[in-house]
UniProtKB/Swiss-Prot annotation:
It comes from the Eukaryota. The lineage of its organism: Eukaryota, Metazoa, Ecdysozoa, Nematoda, Chromadorea. This is Large ribosomal subunit protein uL29. Belongs to the universal ribosomal protein uL29 family. The keyword Ribonucleoprotein applies. One of its GO terms (cellular component) is cytosolic large ribosomal subunit. Pfam families: Ribosomal_L29. The keyword 4Fe-4S does not apply. One of its GO terms (molecular function) is structural constituent of ribosome. Keywords: Ribonucleoprotein, Ribosomal protein. GO terms for biological process: maturation of LSU-rRNA from tricistronic rRNA transcript (SSU-rRNA, 5.8S rRNA, LSU-rRNA); translation.
């Protein structure tokens, strides 16, 4: 089997990709059997290519699946954790802008009753 190109795989349907994946897996199994039974050197070098092809297929399948999920959850309020933006732990725990702007009743009364002082500089 020749090396698969991710560019050509991206346009294909999910079931076609799954079929190709199954073919690659069966080919890998036959190559491994031939390795144990003492197959030709050309078949042994093919194992690496087939393994990489399987990895490429799985990568394309997973990426398209995640892309579809991102489209689905785009207009939802809550998203699954793996689809959210990756932030640092500290940023995730930080107060939101709304939480920062909240004031207690006592603070609101103080700001209402006491005007902001204006200072003039004597020249």
């Amino acid at each position: 089997m020749t090396k698969l190109k991710c560019k050509s795989l991206r346009g294909e349907k999910k079931d076609a990709l799954q079929k190709k994946l199954d073919e690659q897996k069966t080919e890998l199994a036959t190559l491994r059997v031939s390795k144990v039974t003492g197959g030709a050197a050309s078949k042994l070098s093919k194992i690496r290519v087939v393994r990489k092809n399987i990895a490429r297929l799985l990568t394309v399948i997973n990426q398209t699946q995640k892309q579809e999920l991102r489209k689905f959850y785009a207009d939802h309020k809550y998203k699954p954790i793996d689809l959210r933006l990756k932030k640092t732990r500290a940023i995730r725990r930080r107060l939101t802008a709304h939480e920062l702007s909240l004031r207690s009743a006592k603070q609101q009364a103080k700001s209402r009753n006491q005007a902001v002082r204006k200072f003039a500089v004597k020249a």
